[in-house]
A protein has these predicted regions:
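Acidic-glycine-rich active-site phosphate/pyrophosphate-binding loop
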Residues: 26-32, 84-98, 134-140, 192-199, ...
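Flexible, glycine-rich active-site loops centered on histidine and acidic residues
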Residues: 125-159
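Phosphate/pyrophosphate-binding loops at sites that engage ATP/ADP/AMP, CoA/4′-phosphopantetheine
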Residues: 57-73, 223-240, 288-293
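Short beta-strand segments
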Residues: 6-9, 78, 107, 132-138, ...
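Claisen-condensing/thiolase-fold acyl-transfer catalytic domains that form or cleave C-C bonds
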Residues: 55-58, 62, 81-82, 92-95, ...
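Condensing-enzyme catalytic core mediating Claisen C-C bond formation in acyl metabolism
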Residues: 1-47, 148-215, 219, 223, ...
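Short beta-strand-loop/turn "lid" adjacent to the catalytic site in phosphate-handling enzymes
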Residues: 71-84
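Short acidic, glycine/serine/threonine-rich loops at helix termini
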Residues: 16-17, 86-88, 144-148, 311-315
């Protein structure tokens, strides 16, 4: 049994920070950042919590879907930057929405929304759920070294969500994989003390090997799109829309060039949002839907890639 996307939603913090503002305390400039990343600004939480963003995106998706939270059978949330390690971010969303269904998180870094969508589809396929809220919310700016211009200029905060319902022919194809590598892109875990183990001070901030990420990202997008098309029995040219993880414009540009697809079929939100990890894909999907660009029968390729190194691809049919 497949599913249909009933509605989408997204949310961004009110505060938008431009490249020029970053140049006030970093050795950088708008030109330096934009030419290397394609980013002009990013949204940053000031008064908002991650719970606020996740709930706002979820409420919008429910509103568009015409579904009340009490009708949900499951909530799956993708995040690596939750307001709390426990309970799950999904539980906070459920509480504020007034839902009483099972709720839990999935952690697969920037590929997380696709993995969460696959978990939701599995519940539907087994008859365990009929309506599922899938949400991705990230506050990446809390995990950055704001003195490191190579990383802090890339990321922002935000959330995206989708409500799916049993019935329909999505997914047409699924590709999930992991190329195990825990050093290329990582954020250290808890820094605590224990009388039984010597502890060294360590800042819990993101570190990244940019060159490795570039090569990995381009290959992940291209290989996954080709696999999705083959599995669905169509050609890459038959895919109407491409929603890729918004990591860096150079990655997107190189991937689009290699795939040979029209640039107008590729959704881009990077310029004004930066990289918001797993929230990139659902936010971009919501932008696409709000623009009136999606029509019944359209095919949409979602491809996320990130730390782990995890890769997630989904080929959907819009209805």
């Amino acid at each position: 049994m497949g599913f249909t996307i009933l509605g989408t939603g997204s949310a961004l913090p009110e505060r938008s920070v431009s490249n020029d503002e970053l140049s006030e305390f970093l050795d950088t400039s708008d030109e330096w950042i934009f030419t290397r990343t394609g980013i002009k600004s990013r949204h940053v939480c000031t008064t908002e919590s991650l719970d606020d963003l996740a709930v706002a995106a979820s409420e919008r998706a429910l509103q568009v879907s015409g579904i009340d939270a009490s009708q949900l059978d499951l909530i799956v949330c993708s995040t690596t930057t939750g307001d709390h390690l426990v309970p799950a971010e999904a539980c906070a969303v459920a509480e504020r929405l007034g839902a009483t269904c099972p709720a839990f998180d999935v952690s697969a870094a920037c590929a997380g929304f696709v993995f969460a969508l696959d978990v939701a589809e599995g519940y539907i396929a087994r008859g365990r759920a009929e309506r599922v809220l899938v949400v991705a919310a990230e506050q990446m700016t809390r995990a950055l070294d704001w003195t490191d211009r190579a990383t802090c200029v890339l990321f922002g905060d935000g959330a995206g969500a989708a409500v799916i319902e049993a019935g329909g022919d999505s997914p047409l194809a699924v590709e999930l994989s992991t190329a195990p590598d825990v050093e290329t892109l990582r954020v250290p875990g808890l820094v605590g003390t224990s009388p039984f183990k010597a502890s060294a001070d360590s800042a819990s901030v993101l570190s990244m090997n940019g060159r490795r990420v570039f090569k990995f990202g381009v290959n992940a997008i291209c290989d996954t799109v080709h696999k999705l098309a083959i599995d669905a029995g169509i050609s890459v040219e038959d895919i109407d829309h491409f929603v890729f993880h918004q990591a860096n414009e150079r990655i997107l540009g190189q991937a689009v060039k290699r795939l040979g697809v029209p640039d107008e079929r590729v959704v881009r939100t990077l310029r004004e949002t930066g990289n918001i990890s797993s929230a990139c894909i659902p936010l971009a999907l919501d932008r696409l839907a709000n623009a009136g660009a999606l029509h019944t029968g359209d095919t949409i390729a979602l491809v996320g890639f990130g730390a782990g190194l995890d890769i997630g691809g989904y080929l959907l049919r819009w209805k």
